[in-house]
Regions:
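Positively charged, small/polar-rich N-terminal and surface patches that mediate targeting and assembly
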Residues: 1-112
């Protein structure tokens, strides 16, 4: 099992969710987040005053999938989230040692 964490633009959330459901991903956690990468935010004007917006709104998706589904899930996220501009986001993949369903103590892939 592997955990996929993707930080994407909020406007791409529905497309990414739909793409993941289409390939058979049954569960995911979605969090609102703020952050910046290389784009470092931007400058805006309000009532004639300039101010800096350093932390931009993002969405973080977390999902755990079977090893054989990792590449398909990653490609689904990339295809659905890509705009081709700075700030499209990042994907992180890491190994999961164990998954446990709290309700009935099921363990391993069956708990997904």
């Amino acid at each position: 099992m592997q955990k996929i964490e993707a930080v994407i633009q909020p406007s791409k959330l529905d497309a990414v969710k739909d793409a993941l459901v289409e390939i058979g991903v049954e569960g995911m956690t979605i969090l609102e987040a703020r952050g910046h990468g290389r784009q470092k935010g931007h400058t805006e004007f309000y009532r004639g005053r300039e101010y800096s917006v350093d932390l931009l709104p993002k969405v973080k998706l977390e999902l755990v999938v079977k090893d054989e589904m990792v590449e398909q899930a990653v490609q689904a996220i990339i295809t659905a989230a890509r705009t081709g501009t700075i700030g499209d986001g990042k994907i992180f993949v890491s190994k999961i040692d164990e998954a446990i369903r709290i309700r009935n103590d099921e363990r391993g892939e069956i708990a997904l």
